[in-house]
């Protein structure tokens, strides 16, 4: 991802709820109305997750709003299962890792790169409640230190 890209949707909640172990980039197999809606930014990654079936990766439960100018007949189902376009060796690597207890695949970011819509998938382990509290405390302490430094500089 060294080239420039435009972030369309970011799943910030995933980084709070999960500990991200590894990150993968994948393309998406989309219909025309889905592409138009995603380019307009009408997508929600919050409840989404990825699954691997028959050595193919799929993105489930990601909400892409129906396109406003398309008729009902031509529009897509907002929560349909979408195929992820990944290299075969990446999928095989993920099969072994997702079979481990407690690991899942979550979408982290949806972006536009050179005209192609791509998604960043994270191999993640769910955080416990005390881990979430700890990360909140660290973030609050960091803010307090920055405020104190700012006041000292004035």
Swiss-Prot record:
Q: Name one GO cellular component term.
A: cytosol
Matching entries from Pfam families are given as: SmpB
Biological process annotations from GO? trans-translation
Keyword annotations from UniProtKB, A to Z: Cytoplasm, RNA-binding
Which GO terms of the molecular function aspect are on file?
RNA binding
The region called Disordered is annotated at 132-154
Per UniProt, subcellular location reads as:
Cytoplasm
| Coiled coil (residue ranges) | none
Q: Has keyword 4Fe-4S?
A: no
The record's section on InterPro entries has: SmpB, SsrA-bd_prot, SsrA-bd_prot_CS
Write out the function statement from the record: Required for rescue of stalled ribosomes mediated by trans-translation. Binds to transfer-messenger RNA (tmRNA), required for stable association of tmRNA with ribosomes. tmRNA and SmpB together mimic tRNA shape, replacing the anticodon stem-loop with SmpB. tmRNA is encoded by the ssrA gene; the 2 termini fold to resemble tRNA(Ala) and it encodes a 'tag peptide', a short internal open reading frame. During trans-translation Ala-aminoacylated tmRNA acts like a tRNA, entering the A-site of stalled ribosomes, displacing the stalled mRNA.
PANTHER family documented for this protein: SSRA-BINDING PROTEIN, TMRNA-BINDING COMPONENT OF TRANS-TRANSLATION TAGGING COMPLEX
Q: Which family does it belong to?
A: Belongs to the SmpB family.
Under the heading HAMAP family, the entry gives: SmpB
Q: What is this protein called?
A: SsrA-binding protein
